[in-house]
Amino acid sequence: MARYEDLPYRTCVGVMLINREGLVFIGRRAGGIEHVDDTHVWQMPQGGVDPGEDTWKAAKRELYEETSVNSVEKLAEVPDWLIYDIPRTVAGRAWKGRYRGQRQKWFAARFTGADSEINVVHPGGGHKAEFTSWRWEPMHNLPELIVPFKRPVYERVVKEFSQLAAAV
């Protein structure tokens, strides 16, 4: 097994889905070894980018695979790739020990559909559920709800997209 320091970052995307009231979609994670306690189980949709895939297309695909949502309009994109390391204690088990963390491109998208479109229990395309429940949350609360090692990424995403939190 490679040394932790030598492991690459997994290329991923994340989506801040914002409704008409300016609230953000968060899902309660179905589980995973990277989650440290029950108070930090909420997160926004995110996932891997396939080789050669456009990042916005990957973001829409991941959003659909995790939430069944297709009704979105792209609002903004964080200009930089944001990086986080997973704790060394779980690095050997997460992603089969192939990565030390993620390199993420984040997008903000306006949800233009009805809440009834959202289905995290039986998500689009027959994918395995990654969330057990969901809710709309004020943007400023997000960093406190995520696992601590992802918090700096969430703080940056909230800072980048804070002007989008107003209701439309």
Swiss-Prot record:
It comes from the Bacteria. SUPFAM superfamilies: Nudix. CDD domains: NUDIX_Ap4A_hydrolase_plant_like. Its EC number is 3.6.1.-. Pfam families: NUDIX. PROSITE patterns: NUDIX. Gene3D superfamilies: Nucleoside Triphosphate Pyrophosphohydrolase. One of its GO terms (biological process) is nucleoside phosphate metabolic process. Keywords: Hydrolase. A motif (Nudix box) lies at residues 47-68. Residues 8-159 form the Nudix hydrolase domain. GO terms for molecular function: bis(5'-adenosyl)-pentaphosphatase activity; guanosine-3',5'-bis(diphosphate) 3'-diphosphatase activity. Its cofactor is a divalent metal cation. Accelerates the degradation of transcripts by removing pyrophosphate from the 5'-end of triphosphorylated RNA, leading to a more labile monophosphorylated state that can stimulate subsequent ribonuclease cleavage. Belongs to the Nudix hydrolase family. RppH subfamily. This is RNA pyrophosphohydrolase. It comes from Rhodopseudomonas palustris (strain ATCC BAA-98 / CGA009).
